Amino acid sequence: MNNKRHSTNEQLSLDEINNTIKFDHRSSNKQKFLSFLGPGLLVAGGYMDSGNWITSMQGGAQYGYTLLFGNLISRLSAMLLQSMTVRLGIATGMDLAQMTRHYLSRPIAIIFWIIAELAIIATDIAEVIGSAIALNLLFNIPLIVGALITVLDVFLLLFIMKYGFRKIEAIVGTLIFTVLFIFIFEVYISSPQLNAVLNGFIPHSEIITNNGILYIALGIIGATIMPHNLYLHSSIVQSRTYSRHNNEEKAQAIKFATIDSNIQLSIAFVVNCLLLVLGASLFFNSNADDLGGFYDLYHALKTEPVLGATMGAIMSTLFAVALLASGQNSTITGTLAGQIVMEGFLRLHIPNWLRRLITRSLAVIPVIVCLIIFKGNAAKIEQLLVFSQVFLSIALPFCLIPLQLATSNKDLMGPFYNKTWVNIISWTLIIILSILNVYLIVQTFQELQG
């Protein structure tokens, strides 16, 4: 990585929200914390995306609570990587996309941009599919119409942005807590064994010795870190009004932004654990192999004998509501991440509505095409979701490695560069995640061919 200095005429990351939310470094710690409470919510939404739902619930249904430990490891890994993006954004005034373009040679940066754009599209595809399926389950809206409806999210986002970024944070927070409370209720109704749940957070040798458990554990760990979240977080932490030239204020901003991130990621961790616990408590030792998609999960909840007809109907409906909320939540964050990547790599100066419409259209079009080709076949559309998750695995090293190189660069980061122990852990994590994702890609294609 070149040691070029940050250009003074570099366009601000998400300039319409950059440096717009008040942060007074002289205020109380409580006020500072409240000032920085918000960006982590948008990031947490990405860790609760619909693409991870099936893995969690199917893992619980097949192997009980054993995989809760894998969930814990994935969340601790996410906390470390997101804290690095926080430091990058605040210390340098650049987001990850800008940094990659600015400090890598142009040909390499272009390759990284293409992969980043495809990763954003892959993320968005999962949300479009999840939202379209939720609308179909709740209101019997055809999938193709549901996919087209998701385009309207772009204009809703533009409308809300007029009233400030805090409104976006509040809406995302509302959606996250909607999902959280739905699954708290569903897990309560499913009556899991508390001792068995707690025991699931202890590592078991089965995770390594049982190929089936290992595969899903790798899926939980490897697919949890979302590329778009790294671009997103490095940008939106710059929405606060700390001094860009005062290291003391930067240090405070990093401290409270990291606290915010860790709290919100803990909430996402709870949600993903609840999904796994729900799958384990209702479907363990049953026909877990039949829980391959959202429709399967919906109908399994609806017809589960333990719940009864009335409660089964309530549980399945709430599941669809949570799926819709999760899709809308991730739609907002995915659209913003798409804008960050496009601006950061290309320096495009086009109207916000057009930029966001392009980002969303690139995700909706493949879904629409597949719906037409497969005549609305839900199983085929859910298979497209699997392919989108595979591509995210491919794309992950292309944002993790620049992040690691940048945050360990003293000339770039100043006093906020990675300490030796952070470098050791992060490089180890990056290597392991990359190996896991290669393994997942191979296994996924073997399953699809089989």
UniProtKB/Swiss-Prot annotation:
One of its GO terms (cellular component) is plasma membrane. It is found in: Cell membrane. It comes from the Bacteria. It is a multi-pass membrane protein. GO terms for molecular function: cadmium ion transmembrane transporter activity; manganese ion transmembrane transporter activity; metal ion binding; symporter activity. The keyword Ion transport applies. One of its GO terms (biological process) is iron ion transmembrane transport. Keywords: Cell membrane, Ion transport, Membrane, Symport, Transmembrane, Transmembrane helix, Transport. The chain crosses the membrane at residues 34-54, 59-81, 108-128, 141-161, 170-190, 212-232, 263-283, 305-325, 361-381, 383-403, 422-442. Its main location: membrane. The keyword ATP-binding does not apply. Belongs to the NRAMP family. H(+)-stimulated, divalent metal cation uptake system. PANTHER family: NATURAL RESISTANCE-ASSOCIATED MACROPHAGE PROTEIN 2, SOLUTE CARRIER PROTEIN FAMILY 11 MEMBER. HAMAP family: NRAMP. This is Divalent metal cation transporter MntH. The gene is mntH.
